[in-house]
Amino acid sequence: MQHCFRLSWFPLLIALLVHPGHAADPPQQKPAALDIEFKANCDQTTQRYVLLLPEQFSPKEPHSLLIALHGHGSDRWQFVKDPRGECRAARDIAVKYNLIYVSPDYRARTSWMGPQAESDLQQIIEELKSKYQIDQVFLCGGSMGGSSSLTFAALHPELIAGVAAMNPTANHLEYNNFQQAIQASFGGTKQQIPAEYKKRSAEYWPEKLTMPLSISLGGKDTSVPPDSARRLINILKQLNREVLLIDRPHEGHKTSYDDSRAILEFIIQRATSKNEKPAQ
Protein backbone atom coordinates (compact mmCIF):
# COMPACT_ATOMS: atom_id res chain seq x y z
CA MET A 1 0.00 0.00 0.00
CA GLN A 2 2.80 2.40 0.93
CA HIS A 3 4.56 1.50 -2.32
CA CYS A 4 1.43 2.34 -4.38
CA PHE A 5 1.02 5.68 -2.54
CA ARG A 6 4.56 6.73 -3.48
CA LEU A 7 4.03 5.82 -7.13
CA SER A 8 0.88 7.93 -7.26
CA TRP A 9 3.00 11.05 -6.74
CA PHE A 10 5.12 10.41 -9.85
CA PRO A 11 2.72 11.97 -12.43
CA LEU A 12 2.31 15.09 -10.26
CA LEU A 13 6.07 15.37 -9.77
CA ILE A 14 6.68 15.06 -13.53
CA ALA A 15 3.99 17.65 -14.25
CA LEU A 16 5.64 20.11 -11.87
CA LEU A 17 9.09 19.52 -13.34
CA VAL A 18 7.92 19.88 -16.95
CA HIS A 19 6.19 23.24 -16.47
CA PRO A 20 5.25 25.01 -19.72
CA GLY A 21 7.42 27.94 -18.74
CA HIS A 22 10.50 25.69 -18.62
CA ALA A 23 9.83 23.63 -21.76
CA ALA A 24 12.65 23.54 -24.29
CA ASP A 25 12.16 25.69 -27.38
CA PRO A 26 11.54 23.68 -30.55
CA PRO A 27 14.56 23.46 -32.87
CA GLN A 28 14.66 26.11 -35.57
CA GLN A 29 13.65 24.77 -38.97
CA LYS A 30 16.16 25.17 -41.79
CA PRO A 31 14.80 27.03 -44.82
CA ALA A 32 13.33 24.63 -47.36
CA ALA A 33 14.66 24.41 -50.90
CA LEU A 34 12.21 26.12 -53.25
CA ASP A 35 11.79 24.67 -56.74
CA ILE A 36 11.11 27.78 -58.80
CA GLU A 37 9.45 27.70 -62.22
CA PHE A 38 9.71 30.60 -64.67
CA LYS A 39 8.96 31.38 -68.30
CA ALA A 40 12.12 32.00 -70.30
CA ASN A 41 12.20 35.35 -72.08
CA CYS A 42 14.13 34.00 -75.07
CA ASP A 43 11.66 31.31 -76.18
CA GLN A 44 8.75 31.27 -73.67
CA THR A 45 9.56 27.74 -72.47
CA THR A 46 9.16 26.70 -68.83
CA GLN A 47 12.49 26.50 -66.99
CA ARG A 48 13.46 25.85 -63.36
CA TYR A 49 15.97 26.64 -60.65
CA VAL A 50 16.28 25.79 -56.95
CA LEU A 51 16.42 28.62 -54.42
CA LEU A 52 17.66 28.38 -50.82
CA LEU A 53 17.38 31.48 -48.65
CA PRO A 54 19.90 31.75 -45.79
CA GLU A 55 18.82 30.92 -42.24
CA GLN A 56 19.46 34.51 -41.15
CA PHE A 57 17.60 35.97 -44.14
CA SER A 58 16.09 39.42 -43.83
CA PRO A 59 14.34 41.09 -46.78
CA LYS A 60 15.45 44.44 -45.36
CA GLU A 61 19.15 43.56 -45.48
CA PRO A 62 21.43 43.06 -48.51
CA HIS A 63 22.61 39.52 -49.20
CA SER A 64 25.09 38.22 -51.74
CA LEU A 65 24.07 35.47 -54.15
CA LEU A 66 25.94 32.25 -54.95
CA ILE A 67 24.87 30.48 -58.14
CA ALA A 68 26.06 26.87 -58.57
CA LEU A 69 26.03 25.29 -62.03
CA HIS A 70 25.69 21.51 -62.28
CA GLY A 71 27.88 19.15 -64.27
CA HIS A 72 27.21 17.21 -67.48
CA GLY A 73 24.37 14.73 -67.01
CA SER A 74 23.04 16.27 -63.78
CA ASP A 75 20.36 18.87 -63.10
CA ARG A 76 19.48 21.72 -60.72
CA TRP A 77 19.39 19.39 -57.70
CA GLN A 78 23.04 18.28 -57.92
CA PHE A 79 24.48 21.21 -55.96
CA VAL A 80 21.52 21.11 -53.55
CA LYS A 81 21.55 17.42 -52.59
CA ASP A 82 24.69 15.65 -53.86
CA PRO A 83 27.14 14.68 -51.05
CA ARG A 84 30.24 14.96 -53.27
CA GLY A 85 32.88 17.42 -52.10
CA GLU A 86 32.30 20.15 -54.68
CA CYS A 87 28.59 20.35 -53.90
CA ARG A 88 28.91 20.16 -50.10
CA ALA A 89 31.53 22.89 -50.16
CA ALA A 90 29.27 25.24 -52.10
CA ARG A 91 26.37 24.64 -49.70
CA ASP A 92 28.58 25.11 -46.64
CA ILE A 93 30.04 28.35 -48.01
CA ALA A 94 26.52 29.65 -48.64
CA VAL A 95 25.64 28.91 -45.00
CA LYS A 96 28.86 30.42 -43.63
CA TYR A 97 28.46 33.71 -45.49
CA ASN A 98 24.67 33.92 -45.22
CA LEU A 99 24.30 33.80 -49.00
CA ILE A 100 21.22 33.34 -51.11
CA TYR A 101 21.92 30.05 -52.90
CA VAL A 102 20.62 29.19 -56.36
CA SER A 103 21.13 26.15 -58.58
CA PRO A 104 19.55 26.39 -62.05
CA ASP A 105 18.90 23.79 -64.72
CA TYR A 106 20.31 26.27 -67.28
CA ARG A 107 18.47 24.46 -70.04
CA ALA A 108 19.58 20.86 -70.00
CA ARG A 109 21.51 18.09 -68.31
CA THR A 110 24.03 18.67 -71.10
CA SER A 111 23.85 22.46 -71.47
CA TRP A 112 27.44 23.79 -71.69
CA MET A 113 26.15 27.41 -71.52
CA GLY A 114 24.81 27.91 -75.01
CA PRO A 115 22.81 31.04 -75.95
CA GLN A 116 19.55 29.89 -74.34
CA ALA A 117 21.25 28.88 -71.09
CA GLU A 118 23.06 32.22 -71.06
CA SER A 119 19.77 34.07 -71.50
CA ASP A 120 18.10 32.04 -68.73
CA LEU A 121 20.89 32.72 -66.25
CA GLN A 122 20.87 36.42 -67.06
CA GLN A 123 17.10 36.45 -66.52
CA ILE A 124 17.39 34.62 -63.18
CA ILE A 125 19.93 37.14 -61.89
CA GLU A 126 17.83 40.10 -63.01
CA GLU A 127 14.65 38.69 -61.45
CA LEU A 128 16.38 37.86 -58.15
CA LYS A 129 17.84 41.37 -58.02
CA SER A 130 14.36 42.82 -58.50
CA LYS A 131 12.95 40.66 -55.68
CA TYR A 132 15.79 40.75 -53.12
CA GLN A 133 18.50 43.16 -52.09
CA ILE A 134 21.38 41.45 -53.89
CA ASP A 135 24.80 42.81 -53.01
CA GLN A 136 27.22 40.69 -55.08
CA VAL A 137 26.75 37.70 -57.38
CA PHE A 138 29.19 34.78 -57.24
CA LEU A 139 29.30 31.94 -59.75
CA CYS A 140 30.66 28.42 -59.30
CA GLY A 141 30.37 24.99 -60.83
CA GLY A 142 32.13 21.73 -61.57
CA SER A 143 33.16 20.26 -64.94
CA MET A 144 30.53 21.49 -67.41
CA GLY A 145 29.37 23.85 -64.67
CA GLY A 146 32.88 25.17 -64.13
CA SER A 147 33.34 25.70 -67.86
CA SER A 148 29.95 27.41 -68.05
CA SER A 149 30.84 29.66 -65.11
CA LEU A 150 33.92 30.90 -66.98
CA THR A 151 31.88 31.37 -70.16
CA PHE A 152 29.15 33.40 -68.48
CA ALA A 153 31.62 35.55 -66.54
CA ALA A 154 33.47 36.42 -69.76
CA LEU A 155 30.18 37.27 -71.49
CA HIS A 156 28.69 39.26 -68.59
CA PRO A 157 31.49 40.52 -66.32
CA GLU A 158 29.29 43.38 -65.13
CA LEU A 159 27.00 40.86 -63.40
CA ILE A 160 29.59 38.68 -61.64
CA ALA A 161 31.72 39.58 -58.59
CA GLY A 162 33.72 36.34 -58.48
CA VAL A 163 34.07 32.94 -60.19
CA ALA A 164 35.17 29.58 -58.76
CA ALA A 165 35.51 26.92 -61.47
CA MET A 166 36.24 23.28 -60.65
CA ASN A 167 37.82 21.17 -63.42
CA PRO A 168 36.76 23.42 -66.31
CA THR A 169 37.77 23.96 -69.89
CA ALA A 170 38.45 27.53 -70.99
CA ASN A 171 38.65 26.77 -74.73
CA HIS A 172 35.75 25.26 -76.68
CA LEU A 173 37.59 25.44 -80.01
CA GLU A 174 40.21 23.11 -78.53
CA TYR A 175 37.94 20.89 -76.41
CA ASN A 176 36.84 17.66 -78.13
CA ASN A 177 34.69 15.74 -75.62
CA PHE A 178 30.88 15.79 -75.41
CA GLN A 179 30.71 17.39 -78.86
CA GLN A 180 27.20 16.20 -79.69
CA ALA A 181 25.79 17.90 -76.59
CA ILE A 182 27.84 21.07 -77.14
CA GLN A 183 26.74 21.27 -80.79
CA ALA A 184 23.09 21.03 -79.73
CA SER A 185 23.64 23.77 -77.15
CA PHE A 186 25.72 26.13 -79.30
CA GLY A 187 23.72 25.62 -82.50
CA GLY A 188 26.22 23.82 -84.73
CA THR A 189 29.68 22.34 -84.96
CA LYS A 190 32.87 24.32 -84.30
CA GLN A 191 33.60 24.10 -88.06
CA GLN A 192 30.17 25.59 -88.87
CA ILE A 193 30.12 28.35 -86.23
CA PRO A 194 33.69 28.87 -84.97
CA ALA A 195 32.88 32.40 -83.79
CA GLU A 196 30.25 31.03 -81.39
CA TYR A 197 32.74 28.56 -79.91
CA LYS A 198 35.34 31.31 -79.57
CA LYS A 199 32.74 33.61 -77.97
CA ARG A 200 32.09 30.99 -75.29
CA SER A 201 35.78 30.26 -74.62
CA ALA A 202 37.01 32.29 -71.65
CA GLU A 203 40.65 31.90 -72.69
CA TYR A 204 40.07 34.32 -75.59
CA TRP A 205 38.63 37.07 -73.38
CA PRO A 206 40.98 37.58 -70.41
CA GLU A 207 40.48 41.34 -70.50
CA LYS A 208 36.84 40.81 -69.50
CA LEU A 209 37.65 38.64 -66.48
CA THR A 210 38.32 41.48 -64.07
CA MET A 211 36.71 39.81 -61.03
CA PRO A 212 38.49 37.51 -58.51
CA LEU A 213 38.74 34.12 -60.17
CA SER A 214 39.82 30.71 -58.87
CA ILE A 215 40.22 27.35 -60.57
CA SER A 216 40.90 23.80 -59.35
CA LEU A 217 42.39 21.22 -61.71
CA GLY A 218 43.48 17.59 -61.85
CA GLY A 219 46.61 16.77 -63.82
CA LYS A 220 45.25 13.35 -64.82
CA ASP A 221 41.86 14.68 -65.93
CA THR A 222 40.99 13.24 -69.35
CA SER A 223 37.29 14.17 -69.23
CA VAL A 224 38.04 17.91 -69.19
CA PRO A 225 41.81 18.31 -69.73
CA PRO A 226 43.37 21.09 -67.63
CA ASP A 227 45.65 22.79 -70.19
CA SER A 228 43.36 25.63 -71.30
CA ALA A 229 42.47 26.57 -67.72
CA ARG A 230 46.16 26.66 -66.80
CA ARG A 231 46.84 28.97 -69.73
CA LEU A 232 43.97 31.24 -68.72
CA ILE A 233 45.28 31.57 -65.17
CA ASN A 234 48.76 32.39 -66.48
CA ILE A 235 47.36 35.12 -68.73
CA LEU A 236 45.32 36.59 -65.87
CA LYS A 237 48.41 36.64 -63.67
CA GLN A 238 50.19 38.66 -66.36
CA LEU A 239 47.29 41.13 -66.18
CA ASN A 240 47.67 41.36 -62.38
CA ARG A 241 44.23 39.87 -61.75
CA GLU A 242 43.31 38.34 -58.38
CA VAL A 243 43.49 34.63 -59.17
CA LEU A 244 44.03 31.32 -57.40
CA LEU A 245 44.97 28.03 -59.07
CA ILE A 246 44.89 24.73 -57.19
CA ASP A 247 46.52 22.22 -59.53
CA ARG A 248 46.71 18.61 -58.28
CA PRO A 249 49.00 16.71 -60.70
CA HIS A 250 47.93 13.24 -59.50
CA GLU A 251 44.17 13.89 -59.39
CA GLY A 252 41.63 13.16 -62.11
CA HIS A 253 38.27 14.73 -62.88
CA LYS A 254 37.27 15.83 -59.39
CA THR A 255 37.96 18.47 -56.74
CA SER A 256 38.12 17.61 -53.04
CA TYR A 257 35.91 19.24 -50.44
CA ASP A 258 38.84 21.19 -48.98
CA ASP A 259 40.02 22.48 -52.35
CA SER A 260 36.46 23.38 -53.34
CA ARG A 261 36.06 25.40 -50.15
CA ALA A 262 39.43 27.06 -50.69
CA ILE A 263 38.60 28.39 -54.15
CA LEU A 264 35.17 29.56 -52.99
CA GLU A 265 36.61 31.26 -49.91
CA PHE A 266 39.15 33.01 -52.13
CA ILE A 267 36.66 34.71 -54.43
CA ILE A 268 34.29 35.74 -51.65
CA GLN A 269 37.00 37.18 -49.43
CA ARG A 270 38.75 38.99 -52.29
CA ALA A 271 35.51 40.35 -53.74
CA THR A 272 34.32 41.49 -50.32
CA SER A 273 37.63 43.23 -49.68
CA LYS A 274 37.49 44.82 -53.13
CA ASN A 275 33.92 45.98 -52.53
CA GLU A 276 34.84 47.57 -49.20
CA LYS A 277 37.75 49.62 -50.59
CA PRO A 278 36.90 53.34 -50.87
CA ALA A 279 36.61 54.74 -54.35
CA GLN A 280 39.77 56.44 -55.60
Description of each model-found segment:
Residues 58-63, 68-112:
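Short substrate-entry loop that stabilizes the transition state in hydrolases
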Residues 112-131:
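Alpha/beta-hydrolase active-site loop
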Residues 113, 223-280:
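C-terminal catalytic histidine-bearing segment of alpha/beta-hydrolase fold enzymes
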Residues 130, 135-181:
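Primarily recognizes the serine-hydrolase "nucleophile elbow" in alpha/beta-hydrolase
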